[in-house]
């Protein structure tokens, strides 16, 4: 398969999974309520994203690096708001 197409698919997948966190982030930011969000899920998710980011950095995989860096910021922000707002 064409390497450009492979990268394009990677960036498209990365964009979809990253953008998926934005509505939740915005909702918690606006309502100042994270009561119904699972703390355990976001703790594990942020850890997993950090590990994927490290893997992407070590392997030089641009889609992994970009998507996991941004997603980790969004998920980490939700985690911080969960701890702050409950």
From Swiss-Prot:
One of its GO terms (molecular function) is sugar transmembrane transporter activity. It is found in: Cell membrane. InterPro entries: PQ-loop_rpt, SemiSWEET. Residues 6-63 form the PQ-loop domain. It is a multi-pass membrane protein. The chain crosses the membrane at residues 3-23, 37-57, 61-81. Pfam families: PQ-loop (PF04193). GO terms for cellular component: plasma membrane. Keywords: Cell membrane, Membrane, Sugar transport, Transmembrane, Transmembrane helix, Transport. Its main location: membrane. Homodimer. Homooligomer. Mediates sucrose transmembrane transport down a concentration gradient. This is Sugar transporter SemiSWEET. It comes from Bradyrhizobium diazoefficiens (strain JCM 10833 / BCRC 13528 / IAM 13628 / NBRC 14792 / USDA 110).
């Amino acid at each position: 398969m064409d390497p450009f197409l492979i990268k394009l698919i990677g960036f498209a997948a990365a964009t979809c999974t990253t953008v998926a966190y934005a509505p939740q982030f915005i909702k918690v930011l606006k309502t100042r309520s994270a009561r119904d969000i699972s703390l355990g899920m976001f703790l594990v998710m942020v850890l997993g994203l950090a590990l994927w980011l490290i893997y992407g950095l070590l392997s030089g995989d641009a889609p992994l690096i970009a998507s996991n860096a941004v997603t980790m910021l969004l998920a980490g922000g939700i985690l911080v708001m969960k701890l702050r707002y409950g």
